[in-house]
């Protein structure tokens, strides 16, 4: 029993030493997470596609972002689309910093910002990106929505995971639905589970309450892997049109089994 107790005790001590030597191995505290949340202030000058010789005029919006490492900030593409100036600010710091848009993917509504001044990142914790959250898993949405000046944290669960439309691009990608409140200004803010990023707040359903949508971690990781070589190539597309074989008469006309399903390639 004595030897066994010593082995168990030694294992506990080794585990403690590993955690102390590698703080990232432990989940970051709420305060550490808040240190990585960024308020994004963008000035836009959108083109007028009906009158292409002019623009719609300058307007300003605010969104959110998160520090992810390599002195980069991850946010939504629609927050910085057609920007003429992007500034960022951390809670508790009076200074604003000018940011550059390094990469942007309008189809999946993600963008990476960089800042030349390293002092912006002082004492900030770069958050890790996890995998696809499980259904019913609890998440927290961090950001700077309208209604106040400090960081807002709302909590909820992942209620649905499916392929659907991203409003910014009208393209269909994997997304997750959460019942945590997502309001204007939350766009680009991280969705956290167990101290890691599982998504980026993206859009909400206006006709309902507490139905928000996030860009899930697999889409984020695809985007980040794409730009590792210094250029953005985009998401591959299968250039075909399909129709669901739900109509009984259509299946019969194609001589398909009565209870079969599938897709019909139409173009």
Describe every region a protein language model picked out.
Residues 36-42, 48-55, 116-126, 152-209, ...:
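Active-site region of chymotrypsin-like
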Residues 1-5:
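N-terminal secretory signal peptides that target proteins for export/translocation
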Residues 28-32, 40, 117, 121, ...:
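C-terminal cap/linker of serine protease catalytic domains
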Residues 24-76, 85, 134, 223-226, ...:
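N-terminal activation segment of mature serine protease catalytic domains
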Residues 62, 130-134, 148, 152, ...:
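Soluble non-cytosolic domains of exported or imported proteins
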Residues 10-19:
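Bacterial N-terminal signal peptides
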Residues 65-67, 99-101, 158, 265:
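Conserved hydrophobic positions within beta-strands
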Residues 46, 69-151, 184, 208:
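Conserved active-site neighborhood of the chymotrypsin/trypsin-like protease fold
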């Amino acid at each position: 029993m004595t030897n066994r107790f010593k082995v168990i005790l030694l294992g506990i001590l080794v585990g403690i030493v590993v955690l102390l030597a590698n703080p990232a191995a432990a989940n970051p505290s709420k305060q550490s997470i808040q240190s990585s949340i960024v308020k994004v202030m963008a000035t836009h000058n959108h083109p007028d596609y009906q009158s292409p010789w002019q623009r719609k005029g300058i307007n300003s919006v605010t969104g959110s972002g998160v520090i992810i490492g390599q002195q980069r900030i991850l946010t939504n593409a629609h927050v910085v689309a057609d920007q003429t100036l992007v500034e960022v600010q951390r809670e508790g710091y009076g200074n604003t910093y000018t940011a550059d848009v390094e990469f942007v993917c309008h189809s999946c509504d993600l963008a990476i910002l960089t800042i030349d001044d390293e002092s912006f990142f002082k004492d900030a914790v770069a958050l890790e990106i996890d995998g696809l959250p499980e259904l019913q898993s609890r998440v927290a949405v961090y950001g700077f929505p309208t209604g106040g000046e400090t960081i807002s944290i709302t909590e909820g669960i992942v209620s649905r995971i499916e392929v659907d439309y991203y409003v910014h691009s009208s393209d269909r990608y994997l997304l997750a639905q959460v019942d945590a409140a997502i309001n204007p200004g939350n766009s680009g803010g991280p969705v956290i589970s167990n101290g890691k990023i599982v998504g980026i707040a993206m859009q909400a359903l206006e006709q309902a309450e507490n139905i928000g949508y996030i860009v899930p971690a697999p889409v984020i990781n695809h985007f980040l892997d794409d730009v590792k070589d210094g250029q953005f190539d985009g998401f591959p597309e299968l250039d075909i049109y399909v129709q669901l074989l739900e109509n009984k008469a259509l299946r019969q006309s194609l001589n398909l089994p009565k209870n079969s399903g599938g897709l019909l390639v139409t173009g």
